[in-house]
Amino acid sequence: MEDSIIRIAPYHYIHVLDQNTNVARIENGPKTYIRQDNERVLFPPERMVTIPPRHYCVVANPVVRDREGMPVCDGFGQARLRHGDREVRLSQDPFPLYPGEELGQVATALQVVKTNSALHLQAQLDFEDHGEKRVAGDEWLFEGPGTYIPRTEVVMICWINAIVIRHNQGLRLRARKDTRDRDGRDRVTGEEWMVRRVGAYLPGVYEEVLDVVNAFILTEKRALHLRALQTVKDMRDRVRRTGEEWLVTLAEAEAYVPGVEEEVVGQVEVTTLGTRQYCVVLDPVGADGKPQLGQKLVVKGEKSFFLQPGEHLEAGIQDTYVLSEEEGLVLRAVEAFEEKDEAGKVHCRKPGDRWMIRGPVEYVPPVTVEVLSYRHAIPLDQNEGIYVRDLKSGKVRAVIGESYMLSQDEELWEKTLPPNVEALLTPDKDPVLNRNVHQSEAGHQEEGVKKRDPTRVVTFRVPHNAAVQVYDYSQKSARVVFGPELVMLETDEQLTVLSLSGGRPKRPGVIRSLCLLLGPDFFTDVIVIETADHARLQLQLAYNWHFEVKDRSDPMESAKVFSVLDFVGDACKAIASRIRGAVASVQFDDFHKNSSRILRAAVFGLDPELRVRERLLFPQNSLCVTSVDVHSVEPVDQRTRDALQRSVQLAIEITTKSQEAAARQEAARLEQEAKGRLERQRILDQAESERARRELLLLEADSTAVESRGAARAEAESRAEASRIEGEGSVLQAKLKAQALDIETEAELERLTKARERELKYIAEQNRLEVEKTRQLSELESRRFQEMVQAIGADTIRAIAESGPELQVKLLQGLGLNSTLITDGSTPVNLFSAAKGMLGVPAMSMEHRGSE
């Protein structure tokens, strides 16, 4: 700064460097400093450091002060500094920075530590704090409430806020270093503990918060399963070893916060047994709290309990066996024991013994008894039955027509049947209606059919006029049952399956059936024959048949019908052989003319009188064929078939042409008759039309006259009405125009009135705003001048006013003048009274004496 005169305001300072000694000093305001030639001002006047209340700042390289607080100077007159050190200064009067001092931290508000909070501090240097010695590296807490005064030897690590521990909560802590907790207990490094005290907890300096643990709410239906991580005492002061497990229930605590030495395995739900329920607990816990491995305990309802650690249910919650009179249980002893029955008799049961209890009774099996099966009486009609096998002897028998309950030494036996028999025994298959269903079609129908119960006695309803053969393998005999009848198979009996030929021509094994229909019925076959002139023909024939059983009570006679299993195929082959032999000796023309007679003679044969017999009987199975029906005769050779077809077509054409000629003649006759009737009707219609036209002309003339009279009258009336309406309209129009003019005039007057009122209001409001604006501007100007004067200060204004004359006086003193008068041409000087003024006589007193 090159100015010679430097004005230092109050609370400002400058640093002046003496260039001769190279020593800097400080000059504080308020003062006017005149710089010497050998001095240099290092910077313009700068405001002193001001620290507001409850603030602080940090000064680097502070000056050394004596006991009285004054700066210590060295031999050169320069302030001595503590280089590299820092000093914290609190609220005080504004102070300057001495040469070499630096403001390390500007004024900063002191940190207010509230209640339930603290500052984590660490010592950087060794020092003493209120008689307590701190070593570098020490850590401690400054707890609130209070205001923390910082020190240069201490660094703040972080804020620590208290953690609120609510009801049913706990705070899990761990020691970072050997320390003493809030309760005065010594903790080693790494030790963990739990704080359950409700309220705010401020962790210590060496305490680390791991987690806030919520309590487990215990109810009557929920318990807590715990495991000890180390030897510890539980809430009942019972010592728990490492790995030991136990339960905490509602009877011990409503809410439980597990400790650090305890691990929560899970929550256990209550096991509730109804009045008719029970359960078997495996490995139950004894009175000493230890599990009894390998043992069982039966718990009966009504009861609620928790499964202890290590316990589990054998088969869950089971229902008590409530047996009626028709029910029972098959039991087996798993170990030796004694029991009493209802009569008081003692029974010694050995392992493996089987017995059965019957109702009515409510039974809960003990741990020494195993329930093998549940038995109930099987209701059977007189046509129903079951197969029962004795477990001791192995015999199987059928029980039919009575309700039966299996004993402890019996079981249901399943009778297996061949798959084809099972398919034919389905309830929805009727032997009569499905007699023409082939085996491939039957296979598709079997899908989705409910399977037969193999323990039930096999039954088959034989339809009317049918027979079934039952074979007994144990007796090696067969019996035939004629319908209508119900067949019930014994344990060693099987049904005979018939495999019949089917299709056209017949193929073996197409139709399967359990019953043999006795007829009458028919079957159809297709055979190929050859005449004497080598014409090959294909015949489709149908045969009516039935079985002739004279005495159904005779076993030999009844068994004959089953002697030939495929009676259809055998009969068709025999009849086809007869027909081919008979036709081979006949010409085609003869066969074409007499086919029916030739075929009947070939099938039934001739009697001694050369007459055709009435039937054909097969003696081996009593099959009787009664008639032959020729469905079609077709040549096998293509040329023969074409020639026959042409002849048939020619005959058809001749017949058709004759019918067409007759139809044309009849159509021509009918056409002539229709034309005559049409012409006659046309003449009659013309006469009727002329008569109607004459009547129409008469009516038109009358209508024209009436129309003329009506038009004239209507025109006159309309003109009169129009004149009347026009006059009324003119009057109404004049009235409306007058009303419109009045409304328009009133509206214009009202508009002008409102416009003048609005204009007057606008001018008044504008004048008011102008006055208000002028008043506010004057107030602002006066307030600005007042605040400016207050800001500058009276002393400053006086100094500004006196600075000019004082400077002039000093200038005159420098020139050696005792007094002087400086004026300009615009200010006159009274020289007459100047001498009196120099003598110090007031002008007014001199004038007063002169007047006297």
UniProtKB/Swiss-Prot annotation:
Ribonucleoprotein listed as a keyword: yes
Domain of life, per lineage: Eukaryota
Chief localisation class: cytoplasm
GO cellular component: cytoplasm; nucleus; ribonucleoprotein complex
Annotated CDD domains: MVP_shoulder
Entry keyword Nucleus: yes
Cell compartments where the protein resides: Cytoplasm; Nucleus
MVP repeat intervals: 2-54, 55-109, 110-161, 162-214, 215-269, 270-320, 321-377, 378-457, 458-520
Tissues with expression: Expression is highest in brain and enriched in the electric lobe. Closely associated with synaptic vesicles in the nerve terminals of the electric organ.
UniProt keywords, alphabetically: Cytoplasm, Nucleus, Repeat, Ribonucleoprotein
UniProt-listed Gene3D superfamilies: 2.30.30.560, 2.30.30.570, 2.30.30.620, 6.10.250.720, 6.20.380.10, Band 7 domain, Major Vault Protein repeat
A Pfam family the protein falls into: Vault
Signal peptide: none
Subunit structure: The vault ribonucleoprotein particle is a huge (400 A x 670 A) cage structure of 12.9 MDa. It consists of a dimer of half-vaults, with each half-vault comprising 39 identical major vault protein (MVP) chains, PARP4 and one or more vault RNAs (vRNAs).
Entry function: Required for normal vault structure. Vaults are multi-subunit structures that may act as scaffolds for proteins involved in signal transduction. Vaults may also play a role in nucleo-cytoplasmic transport.
Protein name per the record: Major vault protein
Naturally occurring in which organism (per UniProt): Diplobatis ommata (Ocellated electric ray)
